[in-house]
């Protein structure tokens, strides 16, 4: 930089426009790392029998909670139910930088009824997933084993960068599944019931089972 701009004084190597580890509108505008959109159509039968709810209720809940509710809260990147839970779990398991969960969890979840209102179309848009498959924590034994399990360990010599791109799509797909699961549980009134039923804090876990 100094060779190109002789009169410039370098105060610091970063001016924070990079927005590393910070929520920022620029991540939505320009993207950062990998920008991924993942979508799926869930058949009416699956919504009713497996998810125990219905399409219209899910669409309404998503609009009121993830969109309107997040807007009222002044959310910058959090127009979703719990993308951060999924992203941080995968990041820790695969040796990513956990602090980059901040911008990598930027996500907007959309739901709409399709096919004459019978089926559910769900999509998640994550504009700034920051992942890698070489260096850093990816070299740790457990983390490299997880990457190997996913088929994205190390560098791809035939197509440089393809493993990190694939890992980003895995993250997005997992986020979509997590969004569908939690939103269905809330719509069906099962979230609180399951927490109360399986809440381990109600048991003395310090005592070994006899």
From Swiss-Prot:
Report the top EC class in one word.
oxidoreductase
| Entry-listed glycosylation sites | 199
Q: In which pathway does it act?
A: Metabolic intermediate biosynthesis; (R)-mevalonate biosynthesis; (R)-mevalonate from acetyl-CoA: step 3/3
- Any one GO biological process: coenzyme A metabolic process
Its domain of life reads Eukaryota
Q: Which reactions fall under this protein's catalytic activity?
A: (R)-mevalonate + 2 NADP(+) + CoA = (3S)-3-hydroxy-3-methylglutaryl-CoA + 2 NADPH + 2 H(+)
Question: Known Gene3D superfamilies for this protein?
Answer: 3-hydroxy-3-methylglutaryl-coenzyme A Reductase, Chain A, domain 2 (3.90.770.10), Hydroxymethylglutaryl-CoA reductase, class I/II, NAD/NADP-binding domain (3.30.70.420)
Indicate the transmembrane segments per the record.
166-186
Q: What does this protein's UniProt record list under function?
A: Catalyzes the synthesis of mevalonate. The specific precursor of all isoprenoid compounds present in plants.
In the record, the note on similarity to other proteins reads: Belongs to the HMG-CoA reductase family.
| Name of the protein described by the UniProt record | 3-hydroxy-3-methylglutaryl-coenzyme A reductase 2
Species whose genome carries this gene: Hevea brasiliensis (Para rubber tree)
